[in-house]
Amino acid sequence: MLNGIETIFDNTTQMLRHLKKKSFEKNTQDFIDSYGHYFREMTEYVDSISDKERAAEEIADTLINRVEKKFASKKGKIDSRTQVDLNFFMIYYVFPTILGTEHEYAKLIADSICSAWGERFKESQIQYTDYDTLYGSFREKIFGIF
């Protein structure tokens, strides 16, 4: 399940750099085009299992295990700067993409990942929202000033 999902984090630094409304829109579409199949796989997996909560927990465990394997040092820890970037990436790209599937159990999947993420990673009690809310939070340029 979710083989290779850790690759969604390959361009984390680039996708978070100079994050503006226009670049966020483009980055999100590129992210969905490249990695949307992982999020469809998540929803299909939940559909295929009778215990939906357990299925969502398994998805969360799989994702987090792959993140730890990719980013942890030899001591088994993720450095604090990388963790902050991963947290922001989850908030800006991963959770909105999950919710963007508009699947019946998308919120359950997001809740499970969010909860497990906070338990597993130090100082990572993050929240999530959908794409439209995030997109709306970016300011428009006013007379080219902002």
Label the predicted regions.
Residues 2, 6-20, 25-50, 56-75, ...:
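Residue-level detector of alpha-helical secondary structure
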Residues 119-131:
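Recognition helix of helix-turn-helix/homeodomain-like DNA-binding domains
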Residues 50-51, 100:
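Alpha-helix capping and inter-helical loop/turn segments
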Residues 13, 28, 82, 124-126:
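Intrinsically disordered, low-complexity regions enriched in polar/acidic and amide residues
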Residues 26, 101, 126-129:
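Short coil/turn linker and secondary-structure boundary residues
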Residues 68, 72, 76-111, 115:
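Basic amphipathic recognition helices
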